[in-house]
């Protein structure tokens, strides 16, 4: 086995070890646990690979594979809502960005949020949560820091088409704002399979526009912001009560004409104004 394959296997094993650790919280009706919690707790973890890395801010950061791990935990407070915390790690699997950051675990992102699910009927409810997002950028060679941001998300869940929006606003830079809006429609063709097709837009701020694409006298979209469209789907196949295989396909396209024009003039990763990204992984829920 080559050193690269060994490194990839270690990253995947690390994510699965985290999932196994979280499984200690899983309820087993046949066994009596040595501790108890005052409220129901659920969560999970997933380790996966993607063919490229598309930033949540709406830009293509890599065109080579990356390894990612994510874990989350949710405390159900009953009539008082719920608490949610999650964390995400990313590692590059190639030298495409060695000049920017190290390869293994170069970035961590986590959130701590409070949420409330307002039910209108059994099938229609408004799920809202918000809190703080924290980034650790210690793996970057020239951009060390721990930015803090406001993070909020809302879904109007219903049987037909679920609209949603998501806001990220950094405290250290009032211009650094990202807004995602979209619609999705989860469905299950069979009991063990869940598919969520979606389409969304990502509105980026003027500061990131200039940093990624450069200055242009022609941009007029939202005072210099840019917009990216994303369409795709997420699929899960649950092969045991708790374990599942995960797959994601995304196709992004830069909408703003000024951004498309500037991107095509640059000999960088972001010169791609349209790109397809595939992801495959293994997850666990409790």
Regions found by a protein language model. Give the residues of each.
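Hydrophobic, lipid-facing positions within transmembrane beta-strands of outer-membrane proteins
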Residues: 43, 65-71, 108-112, 146-154, ...
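Short glycine/proline- and aromatic-enriched beta-strand/turn motifs that initiate or cap beta-hairpins
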Residues: 26-97, 283-285
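Short coil/turn motifs at beta-sheet boundaries
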Residues: 38-40, 62-64, 105, 145, ...
């Amino acid at each position: 086995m080559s050193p690269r394959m060994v490194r990839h296997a270690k990253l995947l094993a690390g994510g699965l070890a985290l999932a196994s650790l979280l499984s200690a919280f899983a309820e087993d009706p046949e066994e009596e646990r040595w501790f108890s919690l005052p409220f129901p707790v659920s969560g999970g973890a997933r380790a996966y690979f993607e063919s490229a890395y598309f930033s949540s801010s709406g830009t293509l950061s890599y065109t080579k594979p990356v390894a990612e791990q994510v874990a989350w935990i949710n405390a159900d407070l009953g009539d008082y809502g719920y608490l949610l915390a999650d964390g995400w790690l990313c590692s590059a699997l190639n030298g495409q960005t060695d000049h920017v950051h190290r390869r293994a675990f170069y970035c961590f992102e986590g959130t701590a949020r409070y949420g409330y699910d307002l039910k209108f009927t059994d099938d229609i409810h408004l799920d809202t949560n918000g809190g703080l997002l924290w980034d650790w950028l210690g793996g970057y060679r020239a951009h060390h820091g721990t930015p803090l941001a406001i993070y909020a998300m809302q879904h109007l869940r219903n049987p037909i088409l679920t609209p949603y929006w998501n806001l990220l606003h950094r405290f250290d830079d009032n211009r650094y704002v990202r807004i995602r809006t979209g619609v999705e429609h989860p469905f299950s063709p069979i009991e063990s399979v869940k598919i969520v097709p979606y389409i969304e837009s990502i509105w980026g701020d003027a500061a990131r526009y200039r940093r990624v694409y450069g200055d242009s006298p022609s941009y007029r979209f939202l005072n210099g912001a840019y917009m990216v469209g994303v369409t795709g789907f997420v699929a899960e196949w649950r092969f045991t009560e708790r374990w599942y295989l995960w797959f994601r396909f995304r196709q992004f396209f830069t909408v703003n004409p000024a951004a498309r024009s500037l991107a095509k003039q640059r000999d960088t990763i972001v010169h791609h104004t349209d790109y397809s990204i595939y992801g495959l992984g293994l997850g666990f829920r409790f």
